[in-house]
């Protein structure tokens, strides 16, 4: 248990057999890390949230790509308003997980309806790795080095070597607290703006009704 209040760690407790350095698979918290990595790349000018995702994966796109997939943007994916109603790679987990995002038939136009879609975050993690030239968590540790993420933390990969940006983060509770601190302070840490505050405000706001 970690409780941080008024910029102070007021409670920290671990229960056997767990220790402060015990790594836990964080599953869907991974998606938030992927979002921040995308925000960092946007700050670097390496992408725009309104870019069509297919422009970054020409090697994964079929010749007869569906127009709904062709129109889907990075912003649609971050908001989980893609053209898929479910996680695409679960259709056949032996096929290329990223490629499935572009080949599984869509169910509706992107940007319209919220559907929880882990393949969206997974494909965004692949995008981070393409544009940064390194594993996604390594990129985050480098860009956010002032936070001091644990050296032992890592990201699981799919069978094709892509970081599982939707569910693969394996880290300590303190790593999550440091990440939460970054968000709560809108990217400002020790007087340094690590990530644009506008991105964090948008990412943590209520953008899509789900009911």
Region spans (language model):
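A short, well-structured edge-of-sheet supersecondary motif
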Residues: 1-18
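Short, solvent-exposed loop/turn and secondary-structure capping segments
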Residues: 88-91
